[in-house]
């Protein structure tokens, strides 16, 4: 089954690329990793990871979708499948491929044929009511990440209300609050990846 493919989606500016950078930085010594990024007309996210990340350039492929970013990860994911095939040809021992979607709205989801697990990233600056508004990314993702909690006091967001709304929207599905600038919540996400996707014997549960 290797490598495990993990989709990371969310609106523009929510912190998807930064999350990929932090996950690869924290996990690269223990796992063989690669990344695919999706942008409409550029390879800017891939270039950011090459410049600021820990992985060599040949482990990062930037896909230019040329259209709706949602289509490239669901209805017509052929370019992403080609990138996955290329990475598997380059590196036969990969453990994880992160597939980052282009910035999209709350309706974005990954094809289950493309990824084994789906992490959806929102941020508190988008508004306190985002979890309540729902959408497939919020309600159906395997893990919901609520990022930029450090901004909550400045944008008048009540994290307790966001927590309750996330619980209502997601039922038993887990979610985690993060402050990626300070690394808060990253280890919880890694523990979830190890336990739920890599099927390692972990004991920690995602907490809010």
Curated annotation (Swiss-Prot):
Q: Please provide, in alphabetical order, the Gene Ontology terms of the cellular component aspect for this entry.
A: cytoplasm
- Mind telling me which Gene3D superfamilies this protein's record contains? P-loop containing nucleotide triphosphate hydrolases (3.40.50.300)
The primary site where this protein sits is cytoplasm
Keywords in alphabetical order:
Chaperone, Cytoplasm, GTP-binding, Nickel insertion, Nucleotide-binding
Give residues annotated as binding GTP.
10-17
- One Pfam entry for this protein is cobW
Q: Per the UniProt entry, what is one GO biological process?
A: urea catabolic process
> Where in or outside the cell?
Cytoplasm
Q: Which domain of life is it from?
A: Bacteria
**Gene Ontology MF term list:** GTP binding; GTPase activity; nickel cation binding
Q: Which residues cross the membrane?
A: none
According to the record's subunit comment, the protein's assembly and interactions are:
Homodimer. UreD, UreF and UreG form a complex that acts as a GTP-hydrolysis-dependent molecular chaperone, activating the urease apoprotein by helping to assemble the nickel containing metallocenter of UreC. The UreE protein probably delivers the nickel.
Family statement = Belongs to the SIMIBI class G3E GTPase family. UreG subfamily.
What is the role of this chain?
Facilitates the functional incorporation of the urease nickel metallocenter. This process requires GTP hydrolysis, probably effectuated by UreG.
- Which HAMAP family does the record match to this protein? UreG (MF_01389)
* Protein known as: Urease accessory protein UreG
Q: From which source organism is this entry?
A: Halalkalibacterium halodurans (strain ATCC BAA-125 / DSM 18197 / FERM 7344 / JCM 9153 / C-125)
């Amino acid at each position: 089954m290797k490598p495990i493919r993990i989709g990371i989606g969310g609106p523009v500016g929510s912190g998807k690329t930064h999350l990929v950078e932090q996950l690869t930085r924290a996990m690269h010594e223990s796992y063989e990793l690669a990344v695919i990024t999706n942008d409409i007309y550029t390879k800017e996210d891939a270039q950011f990871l090459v410049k600021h990340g820990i992985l060599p350039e040949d482990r990062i492929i930037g896909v230019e979708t040329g259209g709706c970013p949602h289509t490239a990860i669901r209805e017509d994911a052929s370019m992403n499948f080609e990138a996955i095939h290329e990475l598997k040809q380059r590196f036969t021992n990969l453990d994880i491929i992160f597939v980052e979607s282009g910035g999209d709205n709350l309706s974005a989801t990954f094809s289950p044929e493309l990824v084994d697990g789906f992490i959806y990233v929102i941020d508190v600056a988008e508004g306190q009511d985002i979890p309540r508004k729902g959408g497939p990314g919020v309600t159906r993702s395997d893990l919901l990440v609520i990022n930029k909690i450090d901004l909550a006091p400045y944008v008048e967001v009540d994290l307790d209300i966001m927590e309750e709304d996330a619980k209502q929207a997601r039922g038993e599905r887990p979610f985690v609050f993060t402050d990626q600038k300070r690394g808060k919540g990253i280890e919880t996400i890694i523990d979830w990846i190890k336990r739920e996707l890599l099927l390692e014997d972990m004991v920690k549960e995602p907490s809010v």
